[in-house]
Amino acid sequence: QLGDWSCHTLDGPFWGLDLGMPHTVEATVPNPRTQHHFIADESVTHMQFGARGNKPPVSLKWYEGGEKPPIRPEWGIKGFKRSGMLMIGDKKTLMTGGRPNDPVLLLSDEEWKDFQKNPPKKTIPRVKEEAPVDEWINAMKNNRLPGSHFGYAAELTEMALVGVLAQRFAAKIEYDAKNMKITNRPDIDAYIKEPAREGWSYGESL
């Protein structure tokens, strides 16, 4: 799931918090299947991101295979949907679906009514929901980059795949993003760039 859905589910925090690459990733896997080089279908993957300019460090957890985070009483909810995302801040918590869609601030009824009456100003360009092709065409017509251009999408995917490596080996990984190296596990580092067959090499810089 992490290698597939995270590019949808984690797009919001990755972009909004300017996460970049994690320096540490650890996967807790109740029933690892590493002997067959498979990824178990149940795990919790914990990513640690350092400070970014004036933004503080961030801890991110990815739950899959039935694993769920504990529910806090102040959220006022009884359970979670099948998939989704929580952004837990110092003051409030945002909950979305897995895409992530249908965002909801977990507030009391009074706070929610006040928020609806006095919403923050829209300072960020909006993209019509579930219309990425429209955004792509508009970007070409107006000579600008779409939100999910290759420069952005490649980093989002890299973050996810480092997590997948931790899942695959039920391991703790220390990641040097600048050099794209796993510094504490040479055996896992070998999987970042596997040798290409003759005639299929794509070079070092895409």
Where do the protein language model's features map onto the residues?
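Glycine-enriched catalytic-core subsegment of oxygenase/oxidase enzymes
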Residues: 3-5, 10, 14-206
